[in-house]
């Protein structure tokens, strides 16, 4: 959850997801495939799932190892942000605990480049259609 977590934050996240869904619908109506890149927990995942229940909706969790994630974090320009580094660790722990409890395909992207990760997602989409 975002910090600090408040009702206002929940409302803003819900509006953000609603707007993403509406924009996605514009593209779906014209025959395009749509990917929404978002960091979601159970509540937003349910919101997306409900909105797209009549579409071919798939969810993916990109979950590299904590070691790989922290290495990527440390290679960033703003790597001196200890609060964000701690948040990264907390999110990894949370998603690791939830990974088998929600309806999404988990991809370990530890050793994958961006292009390889995209290829893996496409392979998963082809295997489930």
Predicted features by range, described:
Residues 1-19:
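Conserved substrate/cofactor phosphate-moiety recognition/catalytic segment
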Residues 24, 28:
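Conserved ATPase "switch" residues in P-loop NTPase domains
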Residues 38, 53-74:
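Conserved phosphate-donor/acceptor-positioning beta-strand/loop module used by diverse small-molecule
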Residues 120-128:
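C-terminal alpha-helix
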Residues 43-60, 122:
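Short, electropositive alpha-helical surface patch
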Residues 34-37, 106-108:
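Short catalytic-loop micro-motif centered on adjacent basic/acidic residues
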Residues 75-120:
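Small-molecule kinase domains that catalyze NTP-dependent phosphoryl transfer to phosphate-bearing small molecules
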């Amino acid at each position: 959850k975002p910090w600090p977590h408040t009702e206002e934050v929940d409302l803003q996240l819900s509006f953000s997801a609603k707007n993403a869904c509406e924009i996605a619908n514009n593209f779906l109506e014209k025959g395009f495939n749509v990917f929404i890149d978002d960091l979601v927990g159970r509540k937003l995942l349910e919101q997306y799932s409900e909105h797209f229940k009549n579409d071919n909706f798939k969810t993916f969790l990109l979950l590299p190892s904590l070691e790989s994630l922290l290495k990527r974090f440390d290679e960033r320009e703003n790597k001196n942000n200890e609060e964000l580094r701690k948040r990264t660790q907390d999110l990894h722990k949370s998603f690791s605990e939830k990974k088998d409890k929600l309806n999404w395909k988990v991809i370990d992207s530890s050793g994958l480049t961006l292009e390889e990760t995209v290829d893996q997602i496409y392979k998963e989409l082809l295997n489930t259609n």
